Amino acid sequence: MSIQHFRVALIPFFAAFCLPVFAHPETLVKVKDAEDQLGARVGYIELDLNSGKILESFRPEERFPMMSTFKVLLCGAVLSRVDAGQEQLGRRIHYSQNDLVEYSPVTEKHLTDGMTVRELCSAAITMSDNTAANLLLTTIGGPKELTAFLHNMGDHVTRLDRWEPELNEAIPNDERDTTMPAAMATTLRKLLTGELLTLASRQQLIDWMEADKVAGPLLRSALPAGWFIADKSGAGERGSRGIIAALGPDGKPSRIVVIYTTGSQATMDERNRQIAEIGASLIKHW
């Protein structure tokens, strides 16, 4: 067993022997301040990774656009098919120029040779490549099948209805392509620590998230040296922004954090800054 596999296998073990965790309302004060600064709703939840206990939450059962955070769930569904012998990570998928959609920095470079399922998941999570996500959605049967996968996990809230990039439209009061912070946090925890996926697939999923290259201005910008984070960000229309993450000190994750916002007129930089400040408060009061 590799060191990384050992780390993920012992996530519940280490967490069980940690000192009790206590909620700190100071972080919620910052979440509410972010709402004021952005002029928009902000949803927040913080779960203990081992027990699933909610440590703090704000608007945990209000719907927010998922945006690209759905790509972690998508690759979880792909990995479940791999575990069941219905898919192979090494299978190569070929596609054409007509398949390319807006923001496809990886797939646009491989029109000639195609990409493997493993490479597509890596591109979808680490670079948020939209064509990679659409190609992977095709392998599982489309958005409705991802929703069905989530329902089978016990998540009857999260739903995907459309493809990239239309799913980022974020129309107010439109339930399409949305989740709730509580539902997303619980589902992410199941994917990373539950028995739904094999140990190898859980490790692969967290490795992809740990290698995320496009979430630097968010929670990662607030992390002290030595902290662990595996995350996936999302951005959408109407001032929408979000991030889902597993993080913790001492090089291992111990909490799940989900943050979503929508309806702001603020710039992307300002949305990023507010999420980073929430992260800084979380870490300060850990």
From Swiss-Prot:
The active site is at residues 68, 166. Residues 1-23 form the signal peptide. It is an enzyme of class 3 (hydrolase). GO terms for biological process: beta-lactam antibiotic catabolic process; response to antibiotic. GO terms for molecular function: beta-lactamase activity. This protein is used as a marker in many commonly used cloning vectors, such as pBR322 and the pUC series. Disulfide bonds join 75-121. It catalyses: a beta-lactam + H2O = a substituted beta-amino acid. Its EC number is 3.5.2.6. Substrate binds at residues 232-234. InterPro entries: Beta-lactam/transpept-like, Beta-lactam_cat, Beta-lactam_class-A, Beta-lactam_class-A_AS. Keywords: Antibiotic resistance, Disulfide bond, Hydrolase, Plasmid, Signal, Transposable element. Belongs to the class-A beta-lactamase family. TEM-type are the most prevalent beta-lactamases in enterobacteria; they hydrolyze the beta-lactam bond in susceptible beta-lactam antibiotics, thus conferring resistance to penicillins and cephalosporins. TEM-3 and TEM-4 are capable of hydrolyzing cefotaxime and ceftazidime. TEM-5 is capable of hydrolyzing ceftazidime. TEM-6 is capable of hydrolyzing ceftazidime and aztreonam. TEM-8/CAZ-2, TEM-16/CAZ-7 and TEM-24/CAZ-6 are markedly active against ceftazidime. IRT-4 shows resistance to beta-lactamase inhibitors. The beta-lactamase present on pBR322 was cloned from plasmid R1 (R7268). This is Beta-lactamase TEM. It comes from Escherichia coli.
